[in-house]
Swiss-Prot record:
Keywords: Cytoplasm, GTP-binding, Hydrolase, Magnesium, Metal-binding, Nucleotide-binding, Potassium, tRNA processing. K(+) binds at N238, T257, I259, T262. Its EC number is 3.6.-.-. GTP binds at residues 238-243, 257-263, 282-285. This is tRNA modification GTPase MnmE. It comes from Streptococcus agalactiae. Its cofactor is K(+). Binds 1 potassium ion per subunit.
Length: 462
């Protein structure tokens, strides 16, 4: 899209609400400079329309009705089209705090008909062709990134256009294939046309399918980098699960007592393990109980175990294995599991020869071998074949994954039709459907309702 669309001018606070060193109030639209000029007084009284683009300018924000200075500011001027929204943009950098930023915003809104909705700045960047839908979604992922690996390898690469380029190139290749097949069909007087058309369709379909399936194979690692490695800690009550959580978090979050059943719900926290977000789920101890509240916690623990990418089973190594320990070993045997033998600071009584592989002796009381847990997790999920590749494009967005799966299904339908000897012109329908599905990923073929729903998830001011 080369021509910027005409929208109302909008404004919003772009920094988090609350106390802070600075606050930013952003204005975007054709009237941005005119609106800012009504409340901004530069040091030399220079008109904003005469100020060079992409500069910071010292001055004051003044209430024009009272002629009172509200704040000392640095005002950024960025003129279209070289801005995020491809519109004229003013950014007022104020002292932090909700009072002053909100007061300045109210002065601005008094001269406007339209306040910014959540995500509207990014939506305008999309509608004006500055970013595609994958890049717009990457902006939201950057805001929510929990670790630097997610930031660099998933969100930043997507914002830079890695997925957009791959999808657009594939769509163009599909279009070229459809055009070539169409030409061959339109000139049937040549004896070898049908064979050439079928051969071309088969080769290209297999090529596109392999590319999409390779992309799908990145989804598991991409999901882990984006959402975190869901990790459930299980064990009978009072074996040290809550203290283990505190040790990994390096702060007190869970209640640690000698009373069984202290953790009555599922506690979720994130911890950075070598750049990978680990979503630690601290479950209630799984045991038979008559306590209604604790029973609900136990059921939630079992559900967390079923949904976990990784299970940390904590056993008390200072006692022999109990029936409940053996039950938990059986319950988690199909999971990616690490067995932690806690209380190595006490005399050992557990039957080590009855335990499975992947066992780490620890002492949560003395914080012993906690680092080995982190190393083992990294070995299981990210060493060798699982290592994060710097140049790879990762699928991490559920919407993208679902659409790629649909595209693969359409390509499979083409291949199956070719095997059955169906006419190529009938199979063009499925190939065209693949082209349309991929367009939904970038936004070239996305319905308006989807676009509205996606941008509504953004924070106000972005």
């Amino acid at each position: 899209m080369s021509i910027t669309k005409e929208f109302d001018t909008i404004a919003a606070i772009s920094t988090p609400l609350g106390e802070g060193a600075i606050g930013i109030v952003r204005i975007s639209g054709t009237d941005a400079l005119k609106i800012a000029s009504k409340i901004y007084r530069g040091l030399r009284g220079k008109d904003l329309s005469a100020i060079q683009s992409h500069t910071l300018n010292y001055g004051h924000i003044v209430d024009p009705d009272k002629n009172e200075i509200l704040d000392e500011v640095m005002l950024g001027v960025m003129l279209a089209p070289k801005t995020f929204t491809r519109e004229d943009v003013i950014e007022i950098n104020t002292h932090g705090g909700i009072a002053v930023t909100n007061e300045i915003l109210q002065l601005i809104l008094a001269t406007m008909d339209h306040n910014a909705e959540p995500g509207e700045f990014t939506k305008r960047a999309f509608l004006n062709g500055r970013v595609d839908l994958t890049q717009a979604e990457a902006v939201m992922d950057l805001i929510r990134a929990k670790t630097i690996k997610q930031w660099i390898y998933v969100s930043l690469k997507q914002l830079d256009g890695s997925l957009k380029t791959l999808i657009n190139n594939t769509r163009q290749e599909i279009l070229n294939t459809l055009a070539q097949v169409e030409v061959n069909i339109d000139y049937p007087e040549y004896d070898d046309v049908e064979e050439m058309t079928t051969t071309l369709m088969r080769e290209k379909t297999q090529e596109f399918q392999a590319l999409m399936e390779n992309l799908l194979r990145t989804a598991r690692r991409g999901k882990i980098l984006r959402e975190g490695l869901s990790t459930a800690k299980i064990g009978r009550p009072n074996v040290g699960k809550s203290q283990l959580l505190n040790n990994l978090l390096r702060e007190e979050k869970a209640i640690v007592t000698d009373i069984e059943g202290t953790t009555r719900d599922v506690i979720e926290e994130y911890v950075n393990i070598k750049g990978v977000p680990l979503k630690l789920v601290d479950t209630a101890g799984i045991r038979d109980t008559d306590d209604i509240v604790e029973k609900i916690g136990v059921e939630r623990s079992k559900k967390a175990l079923e949904e976990a990418d990784l299970v940390l089973l904590v056993l008390n190594s200072s006692e022999p294995l109990t029936l409940q320990d053996r039950s938990l070993l059986e319950l988690s045997k199909e999971s990616n599991r690490i067995v932690l033998l806690n209380k190595t600071d006490l005399p050992q009584k557990i039957e080590v020869n009855e335990l499975p592989e992947n066992v780490i002796p620890i002492s949560v009381l003395e914080n012993e071998n906690i680092d080995k847990i982190e190393e083992r997790i990294n070995d299981i999920f990210f060493d060798n074949a699982g290592m994060v590749e710097h140049d790879a494009t990762y699928l991490s967005n559920a919407r993208h994954i679902s659409l790629i799966e649909k595209a693969v299904d359409s390509l499979k339908a083409v291949n199956e039709g070719l095997e059955l000897g169906m006419p190529v012109d009938l199979l063009q329908v499925d190939m065209t459907r693949t082209w349309e599905i991929l367009g939904e990923i970038t936004g070239d073929a996305a319905p308006d309702e989807l676009i509205t729903q996606l941008f509504s998830q953004f924070c106000l001011g972005k």
